[in-house]
Amino acid sequence: MNYHLIIQPEAEYDIQDAFEWYESKNPGLGSEFVRAVDACLSGIGRNPLAYQVIHKQVRRALIRRFPYLILYIFDQDTVFVLACFHTKRDPKQWLDRI
């Protein structure tokens, strides 16, 4: 079963910023990043409970090949994507989004 995904605007901005940064470093790398994000989101949509809870209801899924993670909350039949964060960033920044 695929669950409904709602990507918060802040998470969309995170993905766009990372895409632009990777694309500026190496043309085509931004597109690879977006494909990796899409694959991660597909996995979350198929089985949102498979990923670790890291704070209250917030779960995280690591993005393959890139030092980023997806932060989300699963509530009944909907996944709310809160952020796409670089693993070296201060976790306090995403805590403000809860």
Model-based region annotation:
Residues M1-V34:
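Arg/Lys-rich, positively charged N-terminal/basic patches that mediate binding to nucleic acids
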Residues G30-E32, H55-Q57, R89-K92:
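Solvent-exposed interaction patches of small proteins and small membrane subunits
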Residues A39, R46-T78:
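Basic/aromatic recognition patch in beta-strand/loop cores that engages polyanionic ligands
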Residues L69, I73-I98:
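Enriched for short, Lys/Arg-rich terminal
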